[in-house]
Amino acid sequence: MTATFEPNCDPGTLASIQANLGIVNAKIAQAAKDGARDASRISLIAVSKVQPRPRIEAALAAGHRVFGENRVQEAEERWPVYREHFQDLQLHLIGPLQTNKARAAVEMFDTIHTLDRPRLAASLARLFDELGAQRTCYIQVNTGEEAQKAGVLPDNADAFIAACRREYGLPITGLMCIPPADQLPGPHFAFLAEIAKRNGLEKLSMGMSADYEDAIKLGATAVRVGSAIFG
């Protein structure tokens, strides 16, 4: 952080978010220990979508640097100014990506978690080449096969992973899922881990405020936590 950045948040907001981050990080450490895993290899993505600027600035002032947004336009409206002050800031796109927003996403985000179709893969490959910029990519798998939810279907996941690697030359790092709200998340986390393992993928983006501890025990390397941090 540069000396010129002054967070626009009241002391109570700062104290609350500092405390929440401490609690979440402690739970991550305990879940990692319970799962015989290294907590330092698990990334906490603070989901800042729809959060007001004072709460985001409180998280920044508390030392957090990894954030997730659902919409490209929302990120474009507020993150450039923070990029100027925080060189180690990492932005993750965790919401569905329209192909016509791909260029803006590549320019704004460090990691894209929601690659799920050939047309988007082709667009990202072209943009990476054109802009000379590589971004970390996760493939979203619709583990619950929900019609209203984005993500490649499980039966198509292996073929899509292979196509992204061989046909499009994309740097596929791992897989992402959002389990159905009305089902236990554990089986979906385990299912995603199984798909990743057989495809030689080490990263798993899974787990949110209500279930990130379970996700860590089942192999999550990135958890997406919003309300447990921001309230």
List PLM regions with ranges.
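Conserved alpha/beta-domain cores
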Residues: T2-K203, M208-A210, I216-L218
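Gly/Pro- and small hydrophobic-enriched strand-loop and loop-to-helix capping segments
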Residues: H113, A220-G231
